[in-house]
Regions:
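Phosphate-end processing signature that detects enzymes handling 5′-triphosphorylated RNA
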Residues: 2-4, 10, 17-257
């Protein structure tokens, strides 16, 4: 088993070598050559009718992280550090059921929470939930795939998250009554929220960028996992009726960056 220190040391040495001997190679977002089938397009159009927003996301291969950040023109120093905790059973029963329970600490003492279900069919969602200001239906689209999710968000303090993850207070205390009811309605039978274990934390850096050659905000997130692996995600959002047009423009923007 690799320790965090050994992984960091190995990556530091390798990074030093590559920086001096190689020019960063620009990499296309993973899966960028995969197009949706006619059947998938029809399905997306149906889902868009019930969605509040669309998130368009590309995952950049590890070989292209440095070049992508440089090409976008992002200053990594301006990225905001965050710490994400996921909650599930040891056997990941929530994940298998499509249910996500997460708390996220944000720089400055703030934090937020979410209970998310995916996939969902927007047509089957309770109209009462839709009236909540904390509830959102979003279509997550990536090259060659898509999924519709329903989520209830909440806020808390960073200290409250720490109190839960250290066992000082119960997990349910982080979430609102709406979130708890949503969890109870969709969790596998017999799995109460306070029986969940903490997974993580996962450290991430999030940066918001307003490019000159693209007419909307771009979000860049670098996820640094406990095992030493990294994922770089580049995303933007649009209204449902703009989804296909923004997707084409976003793809062109990334290709030129």
């Amino acid at each position: 088993m690799k320790t965090r220190k050994s992984v960091k040391a190995r990556k530091t040495v390798n990074a030093g070598k590559s920086t001096r001997s190689r020019k960063p190679r620009k990499a296309k977002p993973a899966g960028s050559v995969v197009a949706l089938s006619n059947e998938q397009v029809t399905r997306v159009l149906k889902l868009l009718k019930g969605a509040n927003s669309v998130e368009l996301k590309f995952v950049v291969p590890a070989t292209g992280h440095r070049a992508t950040i440089a090409g976008i023109g992002l200053d990594p120093v301006e990225a905001q550090p965050r710490q994400a905790f996921f909650f599930d059973t040891p056997g990941l029963d929530l994940n298998k059921a499509g249910l996500i329970v997460r708390a996220r600490r944000i720089q400055g003492g703030r934090a937020d929470t979410v209970v998310k279900l995916r996939p969902v069919d927007p047509a089957t969602i309770d109209p009462g939930l839709r009236r909540s200001g904390s509830f959102k239906v979003e279509l997550d689209a990536m090259p060659g795939g898509f999924v519709c999710s329903a989520s209830l968000k909440g806020t808390c303090t960073a200290q409250e998250v720490l109190d839960v993850t250290t066992g000082t207070t119960p997990l349910r205390s982080l979430f609102s009554k709406e979130q708890l009811a949503f969890y109870d309605a969709h969790a596998p039978a017999g799995i109460g929220m306070d029986s969940l274990v903490t997974l993580g934390p996962t450290f991430l850096l999030k940066a918001k960028h307003n490019p000159k050659n693209f007419d909307r905000r771009v979000i860049v997130e670098m996820w640094l996992y406990p095992d030493g692996s990294r994922i770089l995600e580049v995303s933007t959002k649009s209204l449902p009726q703009e989804g296909f047009q923004v997707a084409a423009a976003f793809k062109a923007y990334l290709a030129e960056s």
